[in-house]
């Protein structure tokens, strides 16, 4: 605003200059605030017609940034889960190969393989308890607690399978296979090696799977559970419906074998069932891991696209909320000069007015 510098000796001109000075001071205060924080206004009402657009764009930006963070946060736990599944698959594949050659001819090999299977079962339990930070990545909604909370070797599942295999000569292969399947399938307290949260039917457990929101109406599963399949169903005639339980069952069965059973009727049938079940479990496990890998790639790509969207929205918000700093600083300097001129003019007018009164 240009200050009216016309010189008149009446009180009207003096009042006008005082009013102009007040306007300039308000302008200076606004420009000083804008130069300090870079914002058009520190209140929504100060944005005038741009207030509605700022609110809408700000809400959209917050949502997009949240979805981007969700996608980024899911990456670490998913990678840890992938690593655990990959190692379990390798263990299962090793014993799949060993059971193909396991027979009653080489009794010593039976004891060696059994000891290795017991160690492998402990290793699998440890992998199921893999953590990313403080999160158990295969525990789903119960991520603060270990999926396999206790020593798996003393679980009812393992001791039950061991007892059934030990009774192979009396019960026969079919009954033994049925008993090991029942023990591995059980969610009963004291039998299931899994936590209470994960010792539930697979249909119930689907609600425990971790998922992340990456869009207004888009949630993507971001993990798997230790005790239940995710997207790929287990197949075959000898399965619990869970490839992890099937792997555990196989390792517990192999671990319970002994060289003294080499000539027992039903030994070959039990080993063959274990071999077949392991193969089916490996296929389902690798299938689920593959689906999760694809989702990881999807989340990575979405994270990038959400970042681009956030950048674009930030630019639009900035257009409304932020000042052009170079222009603001230039106006600030000019307004300071204008205010100084106003003070000088006011002083001159007051002196003239006083002189008029005294000389009147």
Where are these regions (language model features)?
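Amphipathic alpha-helical polymerization modules
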Residues: 1-145, 259-360
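Polar, low-complexity export/assembly segments characteristic of proteins
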Residues: 17, 21, 28, 32-35, ...
């Amino acid at each position: 605003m240009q200050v009216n510098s016309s010189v008149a000796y009446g009180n009207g001109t003096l009042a006008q200059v005082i009013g102009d000075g007040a306007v300039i001071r308000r302008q200076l205060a606004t420009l000083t605030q804008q130069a300090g924080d870079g914002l058009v206004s520190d209140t929504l009402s100060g944005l005038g017609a741009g207030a509605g657009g700022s609110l809408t764009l700000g809400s959209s930006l917050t949502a997009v940034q949240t979805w981007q963070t969700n996608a980024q946060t899911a990456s670490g736990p998913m990678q840890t889960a992938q690593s655990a599944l990959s190692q379990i698959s390798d263990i299962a594949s090793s014993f799949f190969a060993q059971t193909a050659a396991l027979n009653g001819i080489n009794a010593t090999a039976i004891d060696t393989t059994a000891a290795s299977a017991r160690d492998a079962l402990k290793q699998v339990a440890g992998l199921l308890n893999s953590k990313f930070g403080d999160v158990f990545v295969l525990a789903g909604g119960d991520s603060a607690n270990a999926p396999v909370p206790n020593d798996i070797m003393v679980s009812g599942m393992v001791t039950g399978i061991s007892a059934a295999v030990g009774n192979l000569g009396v019960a026969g292969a079919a009954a033994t296979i049925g008993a090991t399947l029942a023990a591995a399938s059980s969610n009963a307290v004291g039998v299931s090696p899994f936590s209470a949260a994960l010792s539930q039917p697979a249909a119930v457990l689907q609600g425990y799977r971790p998922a992340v929101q990456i869009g207004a109406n888009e949630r993507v599963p971001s993990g798997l559970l230790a005790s239940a399949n995710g997207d790929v169903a287990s197949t075959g005639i000898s399965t619990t419906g869970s490839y992890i339980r099937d792997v555990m069952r196989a390792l517990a069965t192999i671990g319970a074998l002994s060289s003294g059973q080499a000539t027992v009727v039903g030994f070959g049938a039990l080993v063959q069932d274990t071999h077949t079940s392991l193969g089916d479990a490996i296929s389902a496990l690798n299938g689920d891991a593959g689906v999760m890998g694809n989702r990881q790639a999807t989340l990575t790509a979405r994270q990038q696209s959400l970042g681009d969207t956030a950048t674009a929205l930030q630019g639009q918000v900035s257009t409304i909320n932020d000042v052009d700093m170079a222009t603001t600083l230039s106006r600030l300097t000019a307004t300071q000069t204008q205010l100084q001129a106003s003070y000088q003019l006011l002083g001159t007018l007051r002196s003239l007015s006083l002189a008029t009164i005294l000389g009147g």
